[in-house]
Design a protein with these regions (language model features):
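N-terminal interaction/assembly modules
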Residues: 1-126, 130-143
Length: 143
């Protein structure tokens, strides 16, 4: 998830396609280059992990407008453009998992997103992310 978030974040400001970025970043060489920057890059992903990362990044890219619409809808009092890019990437990945990966429980997707956010964002932004994801699940999946 964390690598998928990094790549989704990178897609938000580069002109690369999701496929090209994945092909460039999911290599042993790329991981070796990034290993000193972040511990998540200590070892290149195996085939199963790489497939999961690809599914997330390609799905988030394909459904970006829909996911951003949900973020905008539940970010009460915030314009989407004001939300930090990392926070947006975290929420996009979690929402994609919730909407399109039914084998992942909603609570797990939210918890993982919040834990990753704690590594990169301020406590206030972590609460903001948790609040948006919680509202999204409560409202969109109300029985």
């Amino acid at each position: 998830r964390e690598i998928a978030i990094h790549l989704s974040y990178e897609l938000s400001f580069t002109g690369k396609t999701a496929g090209a970025l994945l092909d460039q970043r999911l290599t042993s060489e790329a991981f070796a280059d990034w290993a000193e920057e972040d511990s998540v890059y200590q070892e290149a992903p195996g085939p199963k992990q790489a497939a999961y990362i690809r599914r997330l990044v390609l799905g988030v890219d394909e459904h970006g407008a829909e996911l951003d619409g949900y973020i905008d809808k539940y970010a009460k009092g915030w314009r989407f453009a004001r939300i930090p890019l990392v926070a947006s990437a975290i929420m996009r990945v979690a929402m994609y998992e919730i909407l399109y990966m039914p084998d992942i429980p909603n609570g797990v997707a939210i918890n993982e997103a919040v834990n990753i956010a704690k590594k990169y964002e301020t406590p206030e932004t972590v609460k903001f992310i948790n609040g948006i994801l919680g509202s999204f699940v409560r409202q969109e999946f109300a029985e």
